[in-house]
């Protein structure tokens, strides 16, 4: 499904742990890393697509995560000309994406990149929050920067509470 401007509707998924780190996934058989993402099927809402992609790409179900935020607007990136499939109709020139920030509620061991016969990823790791902006392929960098900036106000308190808990002499206030 390609829109009138040539963009494929898509969802992107940022999964964070309780320390505010984000899941960074290695594309199958490649040396490139990215967040999970995937197309929205006809008749599917963005949220439904997000849960489907979440299972297909990282083996997690709705019960394994909690939605913390979603981008207010669709974010777009253009594909480099060398990646555009000019022989398809309609021609897809890029992706327009709705992004979701999820908190992992299960154990790391529940993450499974092998739920599909054609997996998207063959490895993953936790990285610091801003790391993906510097490391993602260049044509996605602006979208990643915008996503992470929009979600930062939600994730930063997670990092601060972890830092406080790990500080010698820190005591949680009660009641």
Swiss-Prot record:
Q: Which cofactor does it need?
A: a divalent metal cation
Domain named Nudix hydrolase is located at 6-149
Q: Where does the motif Nudix box lie?
A: 38-59
EC class name: hydrolase
Record-listed E.C. numbers: 3.6.1.-
UniProt GO molecular function: mRNA 5'-diphosphatase activity
Ordered alphabetically, the record's keywords are: Hydrolase
- DNA repair as a keyword of this entry, yes or no, is no
Biological processes per GO annotation:
mRNA catabolic process
Membrane-spanning regions, if any? none
A GO cellular component annotation in the UniProt record: cytoplasm
Tell me the superkingdom of the source: Bacteria
**Hydrolase is among the record's keywords:** yes
The record's Pfam families line, in alphabetical order, gives: NUDIX (PF00293)
> Which family does the entry's similarity section mention?
Belongs to the Nudix hydrolase family. RppH subfamily.
The name on file for this protein is RNA pyrophosphohydrolase
